[in-house]
Amino acid sequence: MNIPAIRGKIGNTIYYSANFTFQQINDLVKKVEGEIYTSAPLKERIQRSLTDNSGKIKQYILDRNDRFFNALVLAVYDGEPQWTEIRFELEDNTFPNVGILYLNGREKIFPVDGQHRVEGIKDALKKNLALANETISVMLIGHSTSTEGMKKSRR
């Protein structure tokens, strides 16, 4: 899958800003699994919170034509993401950091920030398939399953 994106960097974290359709959110983004939140009570609190808040978000999506959300922050690991920069100039200005992020389909993607919105989007899509082509901004960041990588994703 080729994703048009803008590449950015803050500190030592590289991220990609892009848009996903609601259908892509449904198909590609999975719930946070146990390897990130190892504490059972924390996982239970997150799940309870997801159930309550995602229902409100689902209704907001279904009821409002003027709906809007801020960007989802999604962690990507496994697979072999590849970045291809597209260089272009406009009026003597160059624009690096614009390009295509390629995902081969073996990547695992989960929400770091936006779990409620992800689940609300999925639930709304089940009720109204016409929402499939709506888009939401996403920030994609790399995730490592190392101890340090998991700590970073929890922050």
Feature locations, PLM:
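Basic- and aromatic-enriched surface patches that contact anionic nucleotides/nucleic acids
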Residues: 46, 68-74, 78-79, 86-155
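N-terminal extension/subdomain marker
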Residues: 1-70, 74-102
